[in-house]
Curated annotation (Swiss-Prot):
Source species, domain of life: Bacteria
Identification of the protein by name: UPF0173 metal-dependent hydrolase BLi03080/BL00413
Keyword list, A-Z: Hydrolase
Species of origin: Bacillus licheniformis (strain ATCC 14580 / DSM 13 / JCM 2505 / CCUG 7422 / NBRC 12200 / NCIMB 9375 / NCTC 10341 / NRRL NRS-1264 / Gibson 46)
Protein family: Belongs to the UPF0173 family.
A GO term, aspect molecular function: hydrolase activity
Length: 228
């Protein structure tokens, strides 16, 4: 299984049999190495409804006939757009053919901005996503501030790899993310959601270096971690 980072909060998981993508914000993402038309994904996992996370979901899903797994209201909204969706909610889990998904809390907002009509569409509650595939557990925290129940998430799950936002302003900054990493007890922690825009400019290497030896891992855009 190969897990790769593609800028902002975009993460792909390739199991060989399945190709999954988290929060496919590609168009408008100056850091990514992906092009929407080249993405192959049979599963799209969304943490919340902000445009910089929903991103190119509709185009990718329609072209690949992808299953979109998302918090309930966001899934309903995307279902109205003609996508194949599986709605979930915080605390709920589901065993799919590609693996198990469970949603956790995230302290953030969730709304999709339709810029042409200047409408903001409520898309439910934001979430973190626990994905268990081939005996490994990946935690994508989505956009979130620090919250104490991260300790519980860490106690209940043996997390092999966690993706944590460090950009500050809209999410946790590096100091809070450092504490989140401690509470989650993940074997490896990769920083995400930084330096896409000036207001979230951060040094990911400084964050990784602040964690215990071997825990912090900066993935350059397009770089991957392989589990065997």
């Amino acid at each position: 299984m190969k897990v790769a980072y593609h800028g902002h909060s975009v993460v792909t998981v390739d199991t060989g049999d399945h190709q999954l993508i988290f929060d496919p914000f590609i168009t408008g993402n100056s850091l990514t190495d992906l092009k929407p038309e080249d993405v192959k994904a049979d599963v799209i996992l969304l943490t919340h409804g902000h445009n910089d996370h929903v991103g190119d979901t509709i185009e990718i899903a329609k072209r690949n006939n992808s299953l979109v797994v998302a918090p309930n209201e966001l899934a309903v909204y995307l279902g109205w757009k003609g996508l194949n969706v599986h709605p979930m909610h915080i605390g709920g889990s589901h065993q799919f053919d590609f693996g198990k998904v469970k949603l956790t809390q995230a302290f953030h907002g969730s709304a999709y901005t339709e810029e042409d009509s200047q409408k903001i569409v409520y898309t439910g509650m934001p979430a973190g996503i626990l994905l268990t595939v081939e005996g490994r557990t990946i935690f994508h925290a989505g956009d979130t501030g620090l919250f104490s129940d991260m300790k519980l998430i860490g106690e209940l799950n043996h997390i092999d790899l966690a993706f944590l936002p460090i950009g500050d302003n809209f999410t946790m900054g590096p100091e809070d993310a450092k504490l989140a990493a401690e509470w989650l007890r993940a074997k490896q922690v990769v920083p995400v959601h930084y330096s896409t825009f000036p207001v979230i400019e951060q040094d990911p290497h400084a964050f990784a270096d602040s964690l215990p030896g071997g825990v912090g891992k900066v993935l350059e855009v397009g770089e991957s971690i392989e589990f065997k």
